[in-house]
Amino acid sequence: MNSDKADNANSKEQDLNRATSQPQPELTDNLGHRINSDQNSLRAGARGPSLLDDFHLREKIHHFDHERIPERVVHARGTGAHGVFELYESLADYTIANVLTDTSLKTPVFVRFSTVAGSRGSADTARDVRGFAVKLYTQEGNWDLVGNNIPVFFIQDAIKFPDLIHAAKPEPHKEIPQAATAHDTFWDFISLTPESMHMIMWVMSDRSLPRSFSMMEGFGVHSFRLINAQGKAHFVKFHWKPAAGIHSLVWDEAQKIAGKDPDFHRRDLWEAIEKGNYPEWDFGVQLIAEGEETKFDFDVLDATKLWPEELIPVRRVGKLTLNRNPDNYFAETEQVAFMTTNVVPGIDFSDDPLLQGRNFSYLDTQLSRLGSPNWPELPINRPIATVSNNQREGHMRHTINPGQVSYYPNSLGGNQPGEVSAQAGGYVSYPEQVIGPKVRVRSESFGDHYGQAKLFWNSMSGPEKEHIVKALQFELSKVETRHIRQHMLEHLGQINDKLMSQVAIALGEITPPAPKPTNGAIKQTPPSGKAMPDGTADAADEKALLVSAVSSTTASGGIQMSSALSMAGGPKDSIKGRKVAVLAADGVASEQVDALKQALMAAGATAEVVGTHLGSLTGANGSPVTVDKTFANSSSVLYDAIFVPGGVQSITALMKQGDPHEFVDEAFKHAKTIGASGEGVDLLAACQIGQLLGLKTIPTQTQAVEGVLTGSATDIQKVVQSFIKAMAQHRHWERAVVEQVSA
């Protein structure tokens, strides 16, 4: 065991360095033979057949033919990063786990983020749960916290997991659709599985469309146990709370990103770490003393239920920082193997039936994916703690074990390696008393399937409810079998009647309200109680209808609404990690570009100049302005905000093209911050949003209308600061005319 705490944070990196091969000047084959020619195979004459004794050709092709390994059955699409875990408040009253009690330690970690349903080559921005798996290389062995960005799950018992995944994956007769749940088999299963209703509300919400991995929460999902030095146990749920806040994409935006940049999330993570904008999360725990769990009206062993934070607060005790990208994706991110059974002394399992099944599945799946029981010897998986046991042989064994004995007990080897007492750090399972007959039944305490779905719905803001409704309208409209749609509407009616009716109207199951034209019939105002569904944009009438739509909850400890469940009330004081598109052409006011870039950099954000061509533009004052992207290889959906600096020549050129107009209008439709200074306001005025917002001339002072910031060139510093403040809000859902924008 490494006892040098000062070096502990780098201990895994040092371990990986032992397996890292740096490029050398001379080319060799796998057995060290220096290669004279790597361009041509060995032939009988210049135009003759290739020869069998070309061992280099055979080795090269042979290795290439076997490079691929089976992808993960679920969570195939993923990306990862190295980092460090620091504890700043000891949990010694609750556990003996060193990693959770010693505040002087810096524990190395590897984190893998992933989608669930899609294949390894699918897009990052699919509507899906995100895996949030953390491997902590502790001095007592590896601890894997294999979680998600959603605190609950679809099912209560692991025996249903194969059915869930079979239903969610592409339908077997045609292998369609990829990385999508909007199809018959998924919703058929869900409609027949009421326990999934709480999870469905989360998946249909913006939580399943994170803006960035660094802007989503992580949850251990299950109840675990912490055991202290006196043997007393507490049930615990683990949390990761992002320092950057919780923020999302919108569905139309996510679909477009999937085409423009399917690697959007992994690129964002990689670039943030390379720039030193290290993603951070607070580590928190919810704790319930064993014996007190029965006082709640929900079962702490039920993975479809959360513990309301108003009842059991999250105690923040540590921090996770990701600060280093992998050196090789396959060797690290693809070959890393997580297991829920990787726990350390002081952490144990609960009787959650979903967790119990995962404890088998994760060990079992590594054999088929990595091909050998020796997968723990792979560099990314091996612990920094000493390994000493009697496991031997198997495919691709790395360890050389000298000596005569490979069994215990033994006398020929000094009875080593020997058992370790609890006092010396040996793992001892919690002595839970287990009584009961063998039965295949579900506990009655698992029986409430709608109460916490109502809690989640009640807790959403108006725009968040609108997005849930639109997601269900989209997903169920893709279901071709009518009785499945109808069955789902029955479930939605159990959650909230207005939720059900708005989805039903879009599916043609309820007569839509009669339209009432106003202002030239541009917008329809339906009668009270129903709202006309709109397209991809938020509908003001529907938001107004849904904001007051609430239901009485059950299985929630009496809590009717939880602020912890809504993203709307989270911190909005930072733009760290955000990206801004600066639209420009020759003649741009370069001093305005410089002022914006400097302010954004100071705030931890990035500005990219988007122009008509790569290279550089000539500013109005003759100075060069570097172009980062073009209108052909970028899009507004790849940015968090848009800024248009002034410059008569630049704006004249941009106004003659369609792409800049689309950039602005699409960003407005997606509720993003838009800024313009000087003549840049003229471009906004020429777009659809200019007509809708009444933008006409350059204002004499900085103005803000629904997240659109405008100001004069002489007031650029104030414009930029107002722009940054507006960006920190992430999105401007209050826009009333967004549904009229075509983009």
For the regions a protein language model found, what residue spans apply to each?
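Active-site-adjacent core segments of small-molecule enzymes
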Residues: M1-S590, D594-K597, M601-A602, T606, ...
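Catalytic nucleophile loop
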Residues: T481, G611, A641-G647, P660-C687
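C-terminal (or distal) subdomains of carbohydrate-active enzymes
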Residues: S590, E662-E666, C687, G694-K696, ...
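Charged helix-capping and loop-helix junction motifs
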Residues: T626, K656-E662
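Short amphipathic alpha-helix with an adjacent loop that forms part of the alpha/beta core around
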Residues: T630-L638
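Short glycine-rich, flexible loops that bind phosphorylated cofactors or substrates
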Residues: S650-T652
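A charged, well-structured terminal subsegment
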Residues: P699-A743
